[in-house]
Regions:
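Non-catalytic, solvent-exposed interaction/assembly segments
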Residues: 1-109, 133, 148-151, 158
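Small-residue (GG/TT-enriched) beta-loop-alpha framework at ligand/catalytic clefts
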Residues: 13-14, 19-37, 79, 131-239
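Phosphate-interacting basic helix/loop segments used at nucleotide- and nucleic-acid interfaces
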Residues: 58-70, 175, 182-185, 261
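Short glycine-rich phosphate-binding loop at a beta-alpha junction
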Residues: 72-84, 154, 163, 265-280
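Active-site neighborhood for divalent-cation/phosphate handling
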Residues: 76, 80-178, 304-308
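Adenine-nucleotide phosphate-binding core of ATP-dependent small-molecule kinases
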Residues: 216-272, 280-282
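Glycine-rich phosphate-binding loops at beta-strand->alpha-helix junctions
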Residues: 269-297
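Glycine-rich phosphate-binding/hydrolytic loop that grips phosphoryl groups
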Residues: 300-320
């Protein structure tokens, strides 16, 4: 599982499977990104729960139907590891550990000096810094069983998974190429989704910290309103103002991420200088407006006009 800032071939189909939706996109070119094809299919409740496949057979049948409809049969695919099953963390290791021995050392230390929320990880590492006393590495770890099950799902649906990606890096690539990047920034990248918020801090183009924040409230309060046979929008069935008030808990957790970076990770030497907000949350515009009034940092999003398409696409997702 190799996580890199820059992705590979345009011809690879990019696939996202979330608790409530499957989305795909195929690019004609990457810089600037030009979308050639895209599509989405909303899932019944309970097929995927917190990133874990709960009904494998039903999901395979749904995905197989999507593959036929989208005409991506037997294509190579890049898929996202579920955020809820992912850890990004800076780790210090002894300086005398050779670079080609780091992976073995980490496996030995799992459960001892290195603790993860799952027992069997698959991981990748990036060397950050070597000092007189230690090496600092960036650890990307995912739950191996979950990643393997998604790969098996894709294979059984007649696709060829060639790469597992993560949403913080995939979104940062988009931000990187959009022309908004300042190399001096200490960036908080926030992805607001229907049930969860992913908050990642980037320094020198590397994600040095990530936290998943569960949004208060029940997914049962949302219903799908179909635009056509292929797609739709999620509609909140309760009181919108009450829901926006519930997001106070989410903002409190974001405050804690900002404080943790300033006082613990950077030892009061740095603080977040910019916040970029994206995601597929139906109330994203209201959320961005609230964050602009709440935080002293510049709060922005990736310009929608930056992503172009080769033709009029039948796809109303916030990402396209």
């Amino acid at each position: 599982m190799a996580f890199t800032l820059f992705s590979g071939s345009n011809r690879v189909v990019n696939l996202v499977l979330k608790d409530h939706v499957i989305r795909y996109v195929e690019l004609k070119q990457q810089d600037p990104p030009i979308v050639h094809k895209c599509g989405e299919h909303f899932l019944p409740a309970g097929v995927i729960k917190d990133g874990v496949i709960a009904d494998f057979d039903l999901l395979k049948d749904i995905l197989s139907d999507c593959i036929v409809k989208w005409k991506i049969h037997k294509r190579q695919v890049r898929f996202l590891v579920p955020d809820a099953r992912l850890v990004i963390r800076k780790v210090s290791i002894p300086k005398d550990i050779k670079d080609d021995e780091i992976t073995g050392y980490l496996y030995l230390e799992m459960g001892n000096s290195i603790h993860l929320p799952f027992e069997e990880p698959v991981f990748d590492v990036v060397l950050l810094e070597v000092t007189e006393e230690k090496k600092e590495i960036l650890l990307f770890a995912a739950e191996e069983e979950v990643v393997a099950e998604y790969a098996t799902l894709l294979e059984k649906a007649q696709l060829y998974p060639i790469e597992a990606d993560i949403s913080p890096l995939s979104l940062y690539r988009l931000y990187f190429h959009s022309g908004q990047r300042n190399p001096e920034d200490h960036l908080l990248l926030i992805e607001f989704n229907l049930q969860m918020v992913n908050a990642s801090i980037f320094v020198n183009d590397k994600p040095i910290f990530m936290k998943n924040i569960q949004i208060t409230g029940s997914v049962d309060e949302w219903e799908l309103s179909r635009v056509n046979a292929d797609t739709g929008i999620m509609v909140y069935m309760g009181d919108k103002e009450d829901y926006l008030q519930l997001l106070e808990d989410t903002y409190t957790e974001i405050d804690r991420v900002l404080s943790f970076y300033q006082y613990s990770l950077s030892h009061e030497q740095h603080q977040v200088t910019k916040i970029v907000v994206t995601g597929d949350h139906p109330f994203l515009e209201e959320i961005i407006a609230e964050m602009k009034s709440r935080y002293q940092q510049a709060v922005m999003t990736i310009p929608k006009g930056y992503i172009q398409s080769t033709r009029k696409l039948n796809c109303r997702s916030p990402f396209f």
